[in-house]
């Protein structure tokens, strides 16, 4: 979440005339994140988050907003899109598709403990179950086809060692078979900065704009690679097990998922290594923006490749 497209107080006042939310009191840009423009919007009716979508088209976005509504109505702590006076959750502001959603309680954590990992593992499992009844098709815009294309873009910038690792990982993914794994709607970006913790509870899961249909294990791997990683980019076994045990208690993990676990952690690390390399070498213009360090996921990928047996050994206590 960053500010690529500037919105003035007066523009926001005018836009809010299409909603029944009262008078605008405050408008504040949110600098964290890397894809869309976001503002905190405070009116005399409450606090909301405004998102202007920098990459998605207006045709793609209703599915994401419908998914958030679907999950919120089933008890998942996620933002609820606010409909305007015409009954639509999606509008346009400064030439960009735009939406308002409810603002949730809590804050993101820099140093999650095992109890926080267990809490997010439980919520992710509940989200996967709730998402099973969401019928709209949503393809993974950061899937294998995107990874192959992005690898070709960033490869010229890599040193010889990382170029070899990139090629080896692409070859691994070419033969990595996930067809037998349980599939469904996934968040696909469940980092710490996309979760608001309210004490030891999950106050909210935000930023559903990479959500898609894919292997549920991929969603778990993306989250574990951020929530359960030590300072040296190795996995913390205590936090991993807390996360997986809590998830497994809600949606039992399968033997096929256990066998695929080390490989899925590699795929998840590769996806974010590539996106961070792409953001570094091909940045978007913006007012309050920042690119995240790709070296973090480079190290996570190296560990995932080297530590396959140790990764397999840290799993749920019962299948």
From Swiss-Prot:
InterPro entries: Aminoglycoside_PTrfase, Homoserine_kinase_II, Kinase-like_dom_sf, Pseudomonas-type_ThrB. It catalyses: L-homoserine + ATP = O-phospho-L-homoserine + ADP + H(+). It is an enzyme of class 2 (transferase). GO terms for biological process: threonine biosynthetic process. It comes from the Bacteria. Gene3D superfamilies: 3.90.1200.10, Phosphorylase Kinase, domain 1 (3.30.200.20). Transmembrane segments: none annotated. The keyword Zinc does not apply. Keywords: Amino-acid biosynthesis, ATP-binding, Kinase, Nucleotide-binding, Threonine biosynthesis, Transferase. Pathway: Amino-acid biosynthesis; L-threonine biosynthesis; L-threonine from L-aspartate: step 4/5. The keyword Ribosomal protein does not apply. Its EC number is 2.7.1.39. GO terms for molecular function: ATP binding; homoserine kinase activity. Belongs to the pseudomonas-type ThrB family. HAMAP family: Homoser_kinase_2. This is Homoserine kinase. It comes from Methylobacillus flagellatus (strain ATCC 51484 / DSM 6875 / VKM B-1610 / KT). The lineage of its organism: Bacteria, Pseudomonadati, Pseudomonadota, Betaproteobacteria, Nitrosomonadales.
């Amino acid at each position: 979440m960053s500010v690529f497209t500037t919105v003035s107080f007066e523009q926001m006042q005018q836009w809010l005339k299409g909603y029944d939310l009262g008078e605008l009191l405050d408008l504040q840009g949110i600098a964290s994140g890397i894809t869309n423009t976001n503002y905190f919007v405070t009116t005399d009716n409450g606090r909301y988050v405004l998102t202007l979508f920098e990459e998605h088209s207006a045709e793609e976005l209703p599915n994401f907003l419908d998914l958030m509504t679907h999950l919120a109505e089933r008890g998942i702590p996620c933002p609820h899109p606010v409909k305007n006076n015409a009954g639509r959750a999606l509008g346009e502001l400064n030439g960009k598709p735009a939406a308002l959603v409810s603002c949730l309680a809590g804050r993101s954590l820099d140093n999650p403990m095992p109890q926080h990992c267990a809490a997010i593992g439980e919520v992710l499992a509940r989200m996967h179950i709730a998402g099973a009844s969401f019928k709209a098709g949503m393809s993974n815009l950061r899937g294998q086809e995107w990874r192959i294309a992005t690898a070709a873009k960033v490869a010229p910038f890599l040193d010889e060692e990382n170029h070899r690792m990139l090629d080896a990982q692409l070859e691994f993914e070419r033969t990595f078979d996930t067809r037998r794994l349980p599939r469904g709607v996934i968040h696909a970006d469940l980092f710490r900065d996309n979760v608001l913790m309210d004490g030891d509870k999950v106050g909210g899961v935000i930023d559903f704009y990479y959500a898609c249909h894919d292997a549920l294990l991929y969603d778990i791997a993306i989250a574990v690679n951020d929530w359960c990683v030590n300072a040296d980019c190795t996995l913390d076994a205590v936090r991993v097990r807390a996360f997986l045990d809590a998830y497994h208690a809600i949606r039992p993990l399968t033997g096929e998922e256990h066998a695929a676990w080390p490989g899925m952690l590699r795929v998840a690390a590769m996806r974010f290594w590539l996106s961070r390399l792409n953001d570094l070498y091909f940045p978007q213009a913006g007012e309050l923006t920042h690119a995240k360090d790709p070296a973090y996921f480079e190290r996570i990928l190296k560990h995932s490749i080297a530590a396959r047996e140790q990764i397999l050994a840290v799993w749920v206590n019962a299948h």
